[in-house]
Amino acid sequence: MNAELKQDLTEFLRLSLVDDEFIEQYIDDITALLETQGEWADGYVYWQEKGILPEDPEHQYYDEYFDWDENAFVVDGKSYPSLSLADILEQQALSKLTDWKFDAEELEYAVNSMLTNKIKIQCPEETYNDALYPYVQQALAPQNYTLCNYWNGNDSCLFMIFSFEEYERIREIAGKWNISICVVDGGE
């Protein structure tokens, strides 16, 4: 196992506000999965390879094992979370998943769901989608925050908020390990 990857992933997940207990319990599995399959790894296949789930190359029994309320695979009453980075950031981190189409009110709601000190997006009427990004960044700047999007492989946005200082480290780790997260700026 790549010790440097494990250390960087641990820091990345902590900066993303993933619970320390979750990180400690699964960091070896998360590291192995990212190392072998990348950030959109298939947790279903991973738990099959570990012998937890029965072999199912066609994914015929996925729904039989996946509990949508727990966001985990359940076998004999025990839960095994999907450990792809995309799923962890959506389910365990401080993040908000939205459709890729949104207006100012929807984006403001998504961002405020992650903040203690709420913001108000000041923008021209009829401003939508990524054209809103400069306005939300302007609203976040006084709090020393920046809005980021983790591209999760779908036609949705997985928004996350970091302080400017935290984002510098997030950017370093993401660049080193090909993790698809970036500041939203309207030029995407």
Swiss-Prot record:
Pfam families per record: DUF6630
Source domain of life: Bacteria
InterPro entries, A to Z: DUF6630
Name of the molecule in the record: Uncharacterized protein PM0111
